[in-house]
């Protein structure tokens, strides 16, 4: 922490959001796969429709994915796909 009180400190939540999104999507993906679903198809169905029943309740996956806003998920997926940081 700086001793200079003339400057405003900034707090960046974007790294936390990125890490949280990745963690939750990985857990949801694994739960869907363990239950025998195609995780990509199920996640796409959820992201397009907003219907949480595309996500299994197994391991609390549905509750986990609902902690994230769909637009935040899409933002992180697109940034990852395009390798934008």
Swiss-Prot record:
It comes from the Bacteria. Pfam families: IreB. InterPro entries: IreB. PANTHER family: UPF0297 PROTEIN YRZL. Belongs to the UPF0297 family. This is UPF0297 protein Cbei_1105.
């Amino acid at each position: 922490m700086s001793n200079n009180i003339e400057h405003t400190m900034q707090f960046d939540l974007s790294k936390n959001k990125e890490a949280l999104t990745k963690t939750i999507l990985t857990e949801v993906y694994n739960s869907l796969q363990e239950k025998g679903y195609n995780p990509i198809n199920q996640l796409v169905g959820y992201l397009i429709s907003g219907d949480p029943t595309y996500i299994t309740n197994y391991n609390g996956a549905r509750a986990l994915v609902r902690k994230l806003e769909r637009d935040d998920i899409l933002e992180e997926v697109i940034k990852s796909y395009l390798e934008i940081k």
